[in-house]
UniProtKB/Swiss-Prot annotation:
InterPro entries: IF-2B-related, IF-M1Pi, IF_2B-like_C, Initiation_fac_2B_a/b/d, M1Pi_N, NagB/RpiA_transferase-like. The gene is mtnA. This is Methylthioribose-1-phosphate isomerase. Pathway: Amino-acid biosynthesis; L-methionine biosynthesis via salvage pathway; L-methionine from S-methyl-5-thio-alpha-D-ribose 1-phosphate: step 1/6. Keywords: Amino-acid biosynthesis, Isomerase, Methionine biosynthesis. Substrate binds at residues 47-49, 81, 184, 235-236.
Amino acid sequence: MTLPRSLRWTGDHLDLLDQRCLPHTVVYRQLTHWREVSEAIRSMAVRGAPAIGVAAAWGVVLAAKAGDDLDQAIEGLRASRPTAVNLSWALNRMQTSAKSNGWVDVHQLERLASAIEAEDRALTQALVNHGVGVLPEDCRVLHHCHTGAVATAGVGTALGVIVAGHQRGIVKHAWLDETRPRLQGAALSAWELGCCGVPATVIVDGASGLLMRRGQVDVVLVGCDRVAGNGDVANKIGTYNLALAARAHGVPFYVCAPSSSIDITTVDGDAITIEERPEDEITHFRGELVCASGVRAWNPAFDITPAHLITGLITEFGVIRSPSRESIASLPFAN
């Protein structure tokens, strides 16, 4: 089965795959205003750090076509989700381009948004090619959240490595954390691997340590929303727990990090803003209260995994073993 594209630019509007409707229904939303793009990012109709960066770039194009204040549109899009650096990465490029002539060149912005989308396709493919090289033969991979094709404009990051590894006869099985509270692993990763013919089993997030203890995990692969200059990683809540369990059981722990997710200007993980989402994502399920009435919930969307727990960062340039400030600063884009 061919996976649907995460987004499609038509020339006058953005068709956006609504990931909230997956896995049961494929629905595209027709977005004609940058505020609609911002709301789609905030509500997680589009999610995955690379995908939201590309979507935001097209949001700027929509603002330019409408004659809206571009600075206001860019800052509105930037505020939609604060943790993933891909969002600011794309918006900063669009803002620089918009100001380069002293006037708004809509066609120039459209070409740049198209280039950002094409770059994501190319760099995710390069990342996947490098990632397959770290996999042991006949391996069982544990994955957290969702990092597949619909979370990018291309083939995905960590999940893309799993798919490619299976196609090459290296990956035997994938374990998928369900990833509370939004269930991206159960709803999206399981669906995507099923479409690609990869054998997979969904587990509750708390089962990963037991799997490792029993020797049923050979490698952990995750994505990221931001890598700080020292190698600390912000990723979906629960990633830090996985890294601790992997270290305790001697399981390699790799983070797939395209250069658009690496922020050398952020000193370390403590400097990364962690998005906190609504309490009802935890207290309610499909609109029904599942907690005792009046119980409060804390819902950070991300956590920080320190660099010393990471076996390697898989980038489009290659694999950075034991990431550090020095090794990240040596990457081509950092100079």
